[in-house]
């Protein structure tokens, strides 16, 4: 069977763009079990409560829920276990230096297949306050309204 080419989106964390000011993004591989990959091929994963952390010089993705594979047997994986992020040492050090500042966290924004391998896009984010969220929504609505009016004039 030929190796799959290109990118295939598994799950997108749109909530992260709403809740955080995202700055620095990095692509990381994931150390997964076979049944986890099969469950991801079915498109089953939840990034809602997920975050990344650096522990003992290693990066971990915590809170990623990958449900058990339906055709798996008793060797099925634990759905909520922490998963190791595969990053270069300098990338881990750079992310850790940014996260040590107060208010910053590592947020997974996307989970996707790239050339047959599971990748996670991790971003450094600072939490938005309520008035920031309201302003973003108001700006988006105003932009939509302007586009509607421009289309109506044509």
Regions picked out by a protein language model, each given a short descriptive name:
Residues 2-19, 82, 86-100:
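A short, contiguous, amphipathic alpha-helix enriched in charged residues
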Residues 31, 58-60, 119:
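General beta-strand recognition
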Residues 53-95:
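Helix-adjacent hinge/juxtasegments
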């Amino acid at each position: 069977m030929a190796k799959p080419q290109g990118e295939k989106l598994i799950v997108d964390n749109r909530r992260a763009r709403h809740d955080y000011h995202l700055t620095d993004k990095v692509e990381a591989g994931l150390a997964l079990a076979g049944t986890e990959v099969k469950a991801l091929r079915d498109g089953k994963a939840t990034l809602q409560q997920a975050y990344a952390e650096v522990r003992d010089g290693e990066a971990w993705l915590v809170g990623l829920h990958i449900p058990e594979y339906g055709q798996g047997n008793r060797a099925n994986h634990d759905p909520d276990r922490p998963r190791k992020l595969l990053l270069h040492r300098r990338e881990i050090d750079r992310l850790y230096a940014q996260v040590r500042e107060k208010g910053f966290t590592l947020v997974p924004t996307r989970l996707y297949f790239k050339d047959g391998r599971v990748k996670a896009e991790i971003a450094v984010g600072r939490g938005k306050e309520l008035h920031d969220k309201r302003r973003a929504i108001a700006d988006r609505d105003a932009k939509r309204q302007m586009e509607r009016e421009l289309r109506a004039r044509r």
